[in-house]
Amino acid sequence: MQPFISHTGLAVIIDSANVDTDQIIPKQFLSKVTRDGFGVHLFHDWRYLDDAGDQLNPDFTLNKPRYQGASILVSQENFGCGSSREHAPWALADFGLKVIIAPSFADIFYGNSINNGLLPVRLADAEVKQLMAEVEAKEGAEISVDLQALTVTSPSGSQFHFEIAQSARHNLLNGLDAIGLTLSHADTIANYEANIPSWRR
């Protein structure tokens, strides 16, 4: 997992509340267990007019030319609700998104995102609405997110503070998923195992 320090990127809006995991990555695409290749199926039922995924829906935000290459998604409350599926952050990341900004997230999705290097940022509803208005008003609008400073900077330069658990922040800054975090304590684990009495092994 790559460390996340800060990121500035083109922002895209999905102005909907309760975007659930079945909308993010529909169940028919969950047969793979590797993380790659899910981006093409992201928001499948919204992005495409046909089941095969051959005909793009020109009215869907992510398909509009001005948002091509977007790496920051701004949405409404309770993003990532619904069934638990790690494929949801996989699909968002594989599409090229680095940050999701919303007033609130479903708890399981929030944790899965952090564990997969995707930064979920909670901001106040008014701050999210301001970001959406600024992004909508100017083509090519970029947002900056600084995990070290815990700030989000809007296209106009307004700065908002966000909070994240210190453990999650540490793992993202250092590029540590659950396995990486365990391996970072390899010497301590080995020392503990070496000192276990033989009768306990």
UniProtKB/Swiss-Prot annotation:
**Functional pathway:** Amino-acid biosynthesis; L-leucine biosynthesis; L-leucine from 3-methyl-2-oxobutanoate: step 2/4
Q: Which reaction does it catalyse?
A: (2R,3S)-3-isopropylmalate = (2S)-2-isopropylmalate
Q: Which UniProt keywords apply?
A: Amino-acid biosynthesis, Branched-chain amino acid biosynthesis, Leucine biosynthesis, Lyase
- Which GO BP terms, alphabetically? L-leucine biosynthetic process
Q: Which domain of life is it from?
A: Bacteria
CDD domains (alphabetical): IPMI_Swivel
Q: Which GO terms describe its cellular component?
A: 3-isopropylmalate dehydratase complex
EC number of this enzyme: 4.2.1.33
Q: Which GO MF term does the entry hold, naming one? A: 3-isopropylmalate dehydratase activity
Keyword Membrane among UniProt keywords: no
Which proteins does it associate with, and in what oligomeric form?
A: Heterodimer of LeuC and LeuD.
Q: So what family is this one in? A: Belongs to the LeuD family. LeuD type 1 subfamily.
Recorded hits in PANTHER family, A to Z, give: 3-ISOPROPYLMALATE DEHYDRATASE SMALL SUBUNIT, 3-ISOPROPYLMALATE DEHYDRATASE SMALL SUBUNIT 2-RELATED-RELATED
| Physiological role | Catalyzes the isomerization between 2-isopropylmalate and 3-isopropylmalate, via the formation of 2-isopropylmaleate.
Q: What is this protein called?
A: 3-isopropylmalate dehydratase small subunit
What species was this sequence derived from?
Answer: Shewanella pealeana (strain ATCC 700345 / ANG-SQ1)
